[in-house]
Amino acid sequence: MRRVGYIIEEIVEPSNMEASFRQVLRGSKRKRSRQGCYLLAHKPEVLEELVAQIASGTFRVKDYREREIIEGGKLRRIQVIPMKDRIAVHAIMAVVDRHLRKRFIRTTSASIKRRGMHDLLAYVRRDMAEDPDGTRYCYKFDITKFYESVKQDFVMYCVSRVFKDAKLVTMLESFIRLMPEGLSIGLRSSQ
């Protein structure tokens, strides 16, 4: 497939930036927080600053804090970034996600809107009904600490094969290389 360019223009569109602002600040708890109150009071300036940073390719996730959560019986260490940075990351990843989704095979389901476990289950059931002998056995597995084991260089190779916009690739590299090894859990880019 061809590499995609001119993505920055899509990212900095006012509609995309506005949607990202609303998505990050959804819910009354976030709006009442100190960061949320500041962002709401200075919305035009914040969006203007983020648009300028993204358009010039200088946006970087500056700082994060780690938090441990228990989800599904597993202990996970996630990285939490400030809301202002989260708006920019969301704006970038919304457009990147739209371009990547076209390249996924139909049975890719994890973390994809209007797909997921039940959508994939329908495919598995259909395949089992159509070919009972070929689907008699299955192998159930779980990759332990998957995001921590992903090779950053391989992800960068994949990103550079899809996108040719150098500014975008540089910003995505800053998301990918945020952690010493593996991918960050908590950034939208890990989904």
Over which residues does each language-model region extend?
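Non-catalytic, well-ordered alpha-helical scaffold segments
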Residues: R2-G5, E18, P44, E48, ...
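Short, conserved non-catalytic motifs in the polymerase core
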Residues: K29-C37, K62-V89, R103-R115, F175-Q191
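Active-site-proximal segment of RNA-dependent polymerases
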Residues: R3-I8, V89, M93-F141, K145-E148
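Non-catalytic, polymerase-adjacent accessory regions of viral genome-replication enzymes
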Residues: M1-E48
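Conserved polymerase palm-domain catalytic core
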Residues: D127-Q191
